[in-house]
Swiss-Prot record:
Subunit structure and binding partners: Homodimer.
Biased composition regions of type Polar residues, renumbered to the chain: 1-18
Keyword terms of this UniProt record: Chaperone, Cytoplasm, Stress response
Gene Ontology terms describing biological process: protein folding
Protein name: Protein GrpE
Gene3D superfamilies: 3.90.20.20, Head domain of nucleotide exchange factor GrpE (2.30.22.10)
Similarity remark: Belongs to the GrpE family.
Subcellular location: Cytoplasm
Length: 190
């Protein structure tokens, strides 16, 4: 069996792609590679964004933890500072020697207050203000008709806050109007 020249050229023509077919194949490969490149680029950008978000979240958590630690430490100093303030309140009634000691303790107390101020801790006054459950804890209620209801009559423990956020609420006595049933029963007894 011998091959004829026509047969072999036909085989060659069918095995070699035409330039148009080759161009289409290359264009398709190019499109596929571009799509794959775009997909890889999108994945890279997504991973980069996730890493940046994680970094920001960790930084925020770290800052919050540091703030919480500072707050807790400062809170631990409040009772001794308040005790020192109360003790210094009686110094004016003491001897000259005790008054001299009190001056030194007053200076130390000022240093503590300055540290609190530098850390953003401020004391807030409550007496005469309206009761706010976010800033106050009512530990006592007094019925009265002479003062508007929910007015703070007395402050037992000072409140402190950092910015607008309380770190310790003030413990207070709050005014309340007498119940109508109580005033009627008191009138009947008379």
């Amino acid at each position: 069996m011998t091959e004829t020249p026509n047969t072999s050229s036909e085989e060659i023509q069918t095995s070699e792609p035409s330039p148009d077919n080759e161009l289409q194949v290359l264009q398709q490969e190019n499109a596929n590679l571009k799509a794959e490149l775009q997909e890889q680029n999108d994945r890279y950008l997504m991973a980069l964004a996730e890493a940046e978000n994680s970094r920001k979240r960790l930084q925020k958590e770290r800052t919050e933890m540091m703030q919480y630690a500072v707050e807790n430490t400062l809170m631990d100093f409040l009772p001794p500072i308040e005790s020192m303030e109360k003790a210094l309140g009686f110094a004016s009634q003491a001897s000259e020697e005790v008054k001299n000691w009190a001056i030194g303790f007053q200076m130390i107390l000022q240093q503590f207050k300055q540290i609190f101020e530098e850390k953003g801790v401020v004391e807030y006054s409550s007496k005469g203000e309206l009761f706010n459950p976010y800033l106050h804890e009512a530990v006592e209620i007094e019925e009265t008709t002479t003062i508007p209801e929910e007015t703070i009559l007395e402050e037992f423990t000072k409140g402190y806050k950092i910015g607008d956020r309380p770190i310790r609420v003030a413990k207070v006595k709050v005014a309340k109007l007498p119940a109508k049933g109580n005033s009627d029963s008191n009138e009947e007894k008379e």
